[in-house]
Structure formats: structure tokens, C-alpha cells
């Protein structure tokens, strides 16, 4: 299963919401099975509960959840331990670049968002990012509830066109289109 947010046009307290999509994926057939949409507040604190709700709505509790970052909708942070606690699902963030805790914390400080300390504690997980080589190039994995070998295997099974796992890529396009449709309403 892959989850991602749509385009975020504006950050800060007046930003509103953006769409988030979760797409369940069949590794054997290499195709999407179902999807679900939700809304998260940009720079809010609801990403973990919204993603967990989408996972449960898709009947995918216990199945790994792939992300392309621990941030959704600006600095709305996904807590891997929280998702696992709510759904029983391990979480794997697959970065195309080595994530920088220093840059994330700097952005978080300058944003002056509430609960900055809690957000920073979750973001500190990126310090554990492990490089993994794939046929499409290197990726950096932040895994919660998965062994390193299992995380790499999952990435290899879900890569189709590039380094980003296909269910995450499809979730991004789905959420982006939904976000665009919301802006037109």
C-alpha cells in the first residue's frame, strides 16, 4: 500500500486542506487494487490518524504502508509508531535523496508551528535512514516495524518505472488530481 499527499499550494495557518490518497497494491500482479481519499490540514497534526483511517477503510491493516516522506501536507508529520499502533501496519518511507534532519528542523523552527517538539521527535527518525541500492538507483529507507532486508525487498517488489515505489507514485497522482479538483470547487 502506498500513501501520499497532493500538491500543496500555500503553507501556514491559512493554508487549509490538501488531499491524501492511499492505494492498495498487489505485488504479484504489480497493479493497484483499490484506493481511498482523505483530507489533511496543511501543517496540521492529523496525518497519522487520517492515514491510519484510510488503511483501515481499505481493509489493509497489518500490510506495510509505503510513503515518500514522513511529511504530508507541509509539516503535517506521519508518525510511523502511531500508524503501526492504530493499524498494525509497518511503515516504510522511501526517499530518493538522503533526508537531512538539520534542514527539516530548520524549516520546522522557521515555521513556528505548534507542537514543534513533538514533530521534531518524529522527524528525528530520518537520522536512521539506510541507503539501499536498487536497479533504478539508490534510495534511503526509514523503516518502522520492518527489518532492513524486508524493507529493501518491499522497495524492489514495488518499483516499476523509477526509484519511487509504484503505489506511492499512483497515490501522489491521485491525491494531486483530487487536490486540484478541490481547488476548483
From Swiss-Prot:
Pfam families for the chain: DUF99
Domain of life: Archaea
Protein family membership: Belongs to the UPF0215 family.
Protein name, as recorded: UPF0215 protein APE_0476.1
Species this chain originates from: Aeropyrum pernix (strain ATCC 700893 / DSM 11879 / JCM 9820 / NBRC 100138 / K1)
Amino acid at each position: 500500500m502506498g500513501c501520499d499527499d497532493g500538491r500543496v499550494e500555500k503553507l501556514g495557518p491559512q493554508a487549509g486542506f490538501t488531499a491524501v490518497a492511499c492505494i492498495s497494491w498487489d505485488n504479484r500482479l504489480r497493479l493497484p487494487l483499490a484506493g481511498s481519499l482523505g483530507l489533511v490540514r496543511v501543517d496540521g497534526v492529523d496525518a497519522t490518524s487520517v492515514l491510519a483511517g484510510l488503511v483501515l477503510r481499505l481493509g489493509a491493516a497489518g500490510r506495510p504502508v509505503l510513503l515518500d516522506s514522513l511529511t504530508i501536507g507541509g509539516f503535517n508529520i506521519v508518525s510511523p509508531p502511531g500508524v503501526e499502533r492504530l493499524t498494525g501496519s509497518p511503515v516504510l518511507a522511501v526517499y530518493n535523496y538522503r533526508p537531512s534532519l538539520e534542514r527539516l528542523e530548520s524549516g520546522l523552527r522557521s515555521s513556528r508551528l505548534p507542537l514543534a517538539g513533538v514533530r521534531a521527535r518524529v522527524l528525528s527518525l530520518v537520522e536512521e535512514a539506510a541507503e539501499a541500492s536498487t536497479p533504478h538507483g539508490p534510495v534511503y529507507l526509514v523503516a518502522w516495524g520492518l527489518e532492513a532486508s524486508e524493507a529493501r525487498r518491499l522497495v524492489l517488489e514495488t518499483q516499476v518505472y523509477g526509484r519511487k515505489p509504484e503505489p506511492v507514485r499512483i497515490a501522489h497522482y491521485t491525491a494531486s488530481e483530487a487536490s486540484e479538483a478541490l481547488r476548483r470547487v
